[in-house]
Amino acid sequence: MGVFNYEAETPSVIPAARLFKSYVLDGDKLIPKVAPQVISSVENVGGNGGPGTIKNITFAEGIPFKFVKERVDEVDNANFKYNYTVIEGDVLGDKLEKVSHELKIVAAPGGGSIVKISSKFHAKGYHEVNAEKMKGAKEMAEKLLRAVESYLLAHTAEYN
């Protein structure tokens, strides 16, 4: 089994604490609201939101995937860190066993933040991971982040 790493950094004008609170801690409710064209629903099927929690995420029509099942691995409120693993779903196809993500939001000069994501694509057997698949995951995450960011800019009193 090979492991393929992908890292990305995305700047945001939203301060780290506010972005973590909205995008991560309340993301299950907020993201389907602000990006229904991407995510139609997030359902907690086990756990209290902390490590071990299992979530079913259903994609909107028009997205090439139907659903994923994620396991929360770590939530660190003090350091704005969130780790989770995609453990099921058609996004994995027949070549991936799982995809682990480490997300950290850090303060940026000027009051904004930087969202750092490190992803590990765990291939089944000797399969290689298509670079387009990794790029597609980054683009979807950025689209969701921008939707949350736009919402927060329009609703300045929320998530403070």
Curated annotation (Swiss-Prot):
InterPro entries the UniProt entry points to: Bet_v_I/MLP, Bet_v_I_allergen, Plant_def-hormone_signal, START-like_dom_sf
Record GO terms (molecular function): abscisic acid binding; protein phosphatase inhibitor activity; signaling receptor activity
SMART domains: Bet_v_1 (SM01037)
Domain of life: Eukaryota
Keywords for this protein: Allergen, Pathogenesis-related protein, Plant defense
Effect of residue 38 to A: In isoform 1B
Biological process annotations from GO: abscisic acid-activated signaling pathway; defense response
One GO CC annotation: nucleus
CDD domains reported for this sequence: Bet_v1-like
Gene3D superfamilies: 3.30.530.20
Pfam families referenced in this protein's UniProt entry, alphabetically: Bet_v_1
Family classification: Belongs to the BetVI family.
Other information: The sequence shown is that of isoform 1A.
Protein name: Major pollen allergen Car b 1 isoforms 1A and 1B
The organism of origin for this protein: Carpinus betulus (European hornbeam)
